[in-house]
Each structure stands twice: as structure tokens, then as C-alpha cells.
């Protein structure tokens, strides 16, 4: 994992626990994620370790701290199996209603990869007594693991899983003085 992630060390803000990491920690009392993050940080990174689920706030300053905007994200490693028809798309709306303050929602676990920006919600500003609509980005983080290969053997083949799109995501934030997203434009693009 270290050799794979090392070229991207300056682009990784945080890495969270997954079911494999928590099982190794539970059964062997070894925190392999802390080891990985220490290696990345020793290579010039500033990676923070996250738990299985949680929140991150990214704060952006404009003109030497005179003005700032933030993006709130909710992450959860994920759960469940390989939904053959929906590929987990139904969870997108449920998560948006469950975490209405999150600008971006990250989910993983089942190795599906997609981005759904279609969930729009109303946000009420008590201080200004105004209502606005905001998009919530739902990101299934994907994986670089091809568990099916040629489809002849392996755990995923035995369980009848469908092929998944490989790769991850890059998220670019651009601070603009005028924008519909609170001064920040979000661009989400595939990392393959």
C-alpha cells in the first residue's frame, strides 16, 4: 500500500479505517493503518487517520484570511454486499437525508465506484432568514482491487459479484468570490 500511495502523498488529506483494518486490529492487536500513515508522513505527507465513520471540515481562506469558506464531509467505510442492480445508488438519497449538513458524502466497502451530484436539499439560514438549495455530492470511492480477474476463481467469483469499475477520485476546490456553492466550486474527477 505504501509504494502505491507514495507518489500521491501530497494529495492525501486523510485515510480512514475499513473492515479489514479493524479486524486485524481486533484479532492481532496491530494497527496497520497507523503504520501506513506513519510511513506516508515520514515521506513528506500530512495524512490524518480517521475512524470507521466521521466528519471532516475543510476550510479555505481567501486573501490572507480575510474571508473563508468551508466544506463539510461525512465519511463511512461502508457496509453491505454487492448490490447487483442498484450498485448502492439507493443509499445516495438516504445518506443525503441522514446527513443534511454534509456537502460531500463518502462511502466505500463494496468496491463500487460512482459520483451522484443529483441530491438537492433546502438549507435555511437562521441569521439571514433565507432559504437556498444546495447540492450534495455522494461519492462511492471505488477500489483498485480487481477481485474477479478472468472470472474463473476467487472469493468474489464464489459470491457471484459483478465486475466493478476500478479507480478512485480526485476532488478539486476552487475559491471564487462569486459562486452558488458558498464561494467554492467543487470539481470531482476520476482517478484511474
Residue ranges, per PLM feature:
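Extended recognition/assembly regions associated with phosphoester-bond processing machinery
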Residues: 1-192
